[in-house]
From Swiss-Prot:
Subcellular compartments: Secreted
Entry protein name: Ribonuclease pancreatic
Keywords (A to Z) from UniProt: Disulfide bond, Endonuclease, Glycoprotein, Hydrolase, Lyase, Nuclease, Secreted
Gene: RNASE1
Tissue expression: Pancreas.
Known function: Endonuclease that catalyzes the cleavage of RNA on the 3' side of pyrimidine nucleotides. Acts on single-stranded and double-stranded RNA.
Start-end of Low complexity biased regions: 15-24
GO molecular function annotation: lyase activity; nucleic acid binding; ribonuclease A activity
EC number: 4.6.1.18
Length: 128
């Protein structure tokens, strides 16, 4: 069975680089990473940074998770991420996604030994 840590990597890690001008990035990646198998996952974030940098967030700023749990951590630095959101016209099994490329601080939930990210909680824009 897929561990929570492996699932996090499958759903959220794409260290190979950013999608640049490929408007099909979300459609391809959501399919390739098995997030459109039994439904169209409505929103998903891919992080374009080395896995070691994302794992390191577990030892950075401790914050509350959206669900009230206390094992979330916010990255000290901005990270290149891509938000994929299902479009209104999307109909399973033809899942279609819009894409936004952002530079934001990420919030992940961590657990286990080794202590690693198991859930992507949020991304935070530069505070104005």
């Amino acid at each position: 069975k897929e561990s929570s840590a492996m699932k996090f990597e499958r759903q959220h890690m794409d260290s190979s680089g950013s999608p640049s001008s490929n408007s099909n990035y979300c459609n391809e990646m959501m399919r390739r990473r098995n997030m459109t198998q039994d439904r169209c996952k409505p929103v998903n974030t891919f992080v374009h940074e080395p896995l070691a940098d994302v794992r390191a967030v577990c030892f950075q700023k401790n914050v509350a998770c959206k669900n009230g749990q206390t094992n979330c951590y916010q990255s000290n630095s901005l990270m290149h991420i891509t938000d994929c959101r299902v479009t209104g016209s999307s109909k399973y099994p033809d899942c279609s996604y819009g894409m936004s490329q952002l530079e934001r601080s990420i919030v992940v939930a961590c657990e286990g030994s080794p202590y690693v990210p198991v859930h992507f909680d949020a991304s935070v824009g530069p505070s104005t």
